[in-house]
Amino acid sequence: MKTVVIIAASGVGKRMKLDGGRSKQMLEIGGQPVIWHTMKAFQEASTVESVYIATLPDSIPVFKEIAKANGFTKITAIIEGGKERQDSIGNCMKLIEQEIENSGVMPDAILVHDGARPFIQPEEIDDIARLSATHGACVPATKPKDTIKYVGCNPEIFGETLDRSRLLQVQTPQGFAPAKLIEAHRLAGEEQWYATDDAALVERYFPQQAIRIYETGYHNIKITTPEDVFIGEAILAGLKARKSKN
């Protein structure tokens, strides 16, 4: 099976309150940068053939050195990201389209992942890739622990309470049949329509495409706020302990 991966890693960590637009991908958890953990997971996933990363210009040489020093051979290209997350993914998509045209080989699936989600596991990546190839689309998610409410017309007053049993918190990597994801990004670019994730693009332009749910654990967090670094240390320790038992 051939899976191609795009990692969006251009976040500057505004909510992390980092100085000088520093990349949150370089924050250390367990003595290694966040992006190191992310690269390692995809390197170890058996279904993954190549990985394209979009990041900040200043991070490109640093990321390349991390990949080289650690033998992350599946990292195919590390390029400059765009203004928005969707633009960054689009930049990688252009390279993937060129590779498809040159090789004449269509991947079985394309996965899109947030670089700031360092705890996705290789076996989960493989599961999502296979389900994406089989069903055309697959997105990981977790059940919310908290009650979710709408905000009312008055932004200081709650509206209705949502039925938590029908809600899921969506994560990445999100996997898709390559042709549909490529076309969805092309159409969104023409329309200048931006979404917060790739599943929303596929939902908009291919409403007939069912998206398979892949329920993950609560370890696959996105490093977004300062508290997440401390939570990440605990998650990493738990993952290591679980692996040592096995």
Swiss-Prot record:
This is 2-C-methyl-D-erythritol 4-phosphate cytidylyltransferase. Keywords: Isoprene biosynthesis, Nucleotidyltransferase, Transferase. HAMAP family: IspD. One of its GO terms (biological process) is isopentenyl diphosphate biosynthetic process, methylerythritol 4-phosphate pathway. The record marks 164, 222 as: Positions MEP for the nucleophilic attack. GO terms for molecular function: 2-C-methyl-D-erythritol 4-phosphate cytidylyltransferase activity. Catalyzes the formation of 4-diphosphocytidyl-2-C-methyl-D-erythritol from CTP and 2-C-methyl-D-erythritol 4-phosphate (MEP). SUPFAM superfamilies: Nucleotide-diphospho-sugar transferases. It catalyses: 2-C-methyl-D-erythritol 4-phosphate + CTP + H(+) = 4-CDP-2-C-methyl-D-erythritol + diphosphate. Belongs to the IspD/TarI cytidylyltransferase family. IspD subfamily. The keyword Transferase applies. The record marks 15, 24 as: Transition state stabilizer. Pathway: Isoprenoid biosynthesis; isopentenyl diphosphate biosynthesis via DXP pathway; isopentenyl diphosphate from 1-deoxy-D-xylulose 5-phosphate: step 2/6. PANTHER family: 2-C-METHYL-D-ERYTHRITOL 4-PHOSPHATE CYTIDYLYLTRANSFERASE, CHLOROPLASTIC.
